[in-house]
Amino acid sequence: MKIIYDIDCLLYFLKVERTDLLEDEFDRIVISNKVFNSLNNPSIPDFIKEQLNILVDKEFVKVEEISYNTDTFDIYYELINENKDQILGAGEAASIAIAIKNKGIIAYNNPDAIKDYLEKCDLKCITLEDMLNALFKKGTLSKKEFEELFSKSNNY
């Protein structure tokens, strides 16, 4: 099953320099080209861009393009134009579109913000908290590491 990351979850692991935890948990993750471009914005610190590009180069992170005249683009376009009460950013809409097209799981820190889309499209969502709990239960994280990472998550 594909895990499609929105910017917030991935950015956390990049900021705390613990992408090794993602690599322990998943074979590969997917991000949209919109998320990739946002993370390569000049305002993003170089160490984050470098880590991301290393993960892409070693093919742990797959950047999925949202191209015109594709089913994924049609879904994306519908998402950004459909519900004016619940406006999605380009990265969020792209991540949701890829998850819908691939019947994947979306990694997103605020599922309440996209609840309507999750329900309508029958998508599963995992949060940073879900991931940290799973890593702790598996024994990948000690209690001390879990507590440190969890407390840092409130800052992001």
Features from the language model and the residues they span:
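Active-site-proximal, substrate-binding regions of enzyme catalytic domains
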Residues: K2-I98, N102-G104, K115, E147-F150
